[in-house]
Regions:
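Glycine-rich phosphate/diphosphate-binding loop of Rossmann-like nucleotide-binding domains
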Residues: 8-57
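Electropositive phosphate-/nucleotide-binding environments in soluble metabolic enzymes
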Residues: 15, 27, 31, 35, ...
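Short, ordered loop/turn segments at secondary-structure junctions
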Residues: 24-25, 83-84, 119-123
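Generic secondary-structure signature for well-ordered alpha-helical cores
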Residues: 27, 42-47, 67-74, 104-109, ...
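Short beta-strand segments at enzyme active-site cores
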Residues: 53, 76-81, 113-119
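Glycine-rich oxoanion-binding loops at beta->alpha junctions
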Residues: 54-72, 118-119, 123-124
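Glycine-rich phosphate-binding loop
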Residues: 61, 65-102
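C-terminal binding/interaction regions
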Residues: 92, 96-160
């Protein structure tokens, strides 16, 4: 890439609006993801008024709430937050697949970044490690992606 300078987003939250959709199922773990995401956005300049949190029953309902938020035109980026744990039936695969596909469809349809912070884990211990434990907080990481993509979107669609 000699001579080429890639265009990347920055981690600026000031002046941007973020919509977070968080499931209530596995609520203790999701609350940790949500706390990490809100903390990250705030530390990077997003005001409390610019962060809107919508709670839905479970991961299955996340995509439709993302669709509603994206369709409102009020947000620079969206975040999906949830925890799905593998059980004894194929239900896990159905829920995880449709949640991720639905989030991607919303981003494609509306051109609004959707950061995916839905944990799909085999055990509660794996989820706890990723929701603020030894593997970090994936809610915080999703918020970083949302910040960067919101800025990149603005730079690409409204160049100064």
């Amino acid at each position: 890439m000699a001579g080429a300078r890639p265009l990347e987003g920055t981690l600026r939250g000031d002046g941007r609006r973020f919509g977070l959709v968080a499931s209530r199922f596995n609520g203790t773990l999701v609350d940790q993801l949500l706390g990490g995401a809100v903390d990250c956005l705030s530390r990077h300049g997003a005001s409390p008024e610019a962060i809107e949190v919508v709670r839905v029953p479970g991961a299955w309902e996340i995509p439709v709430a993302l669709e509603w938020l994206a369709g409102s035109g009020r947000f620079d980026a969206l975040l999906a937050l949830g925890v799905v744990l593998r059980g004894e039936t194929p239900h896990f695969e159905f829920i995880c697949g449709e949640c991720s596909r639905g989030a991607a469809r919303v981003a494609d349809r509306h051109g609004v970044p959707v950061a995916f912070g839905v944990l799909t884990c085999d055990t509660p211990e794996q989820a706890a490690a990723r929701a603020g434990g030894k593997a970090g907080n994936k809610g915080w990481e999703a918020a970083l992606a949302a910040l960067e993509m919101a800025d990149l979107r603005a730079r690409l669609t409204h160049p100064d």
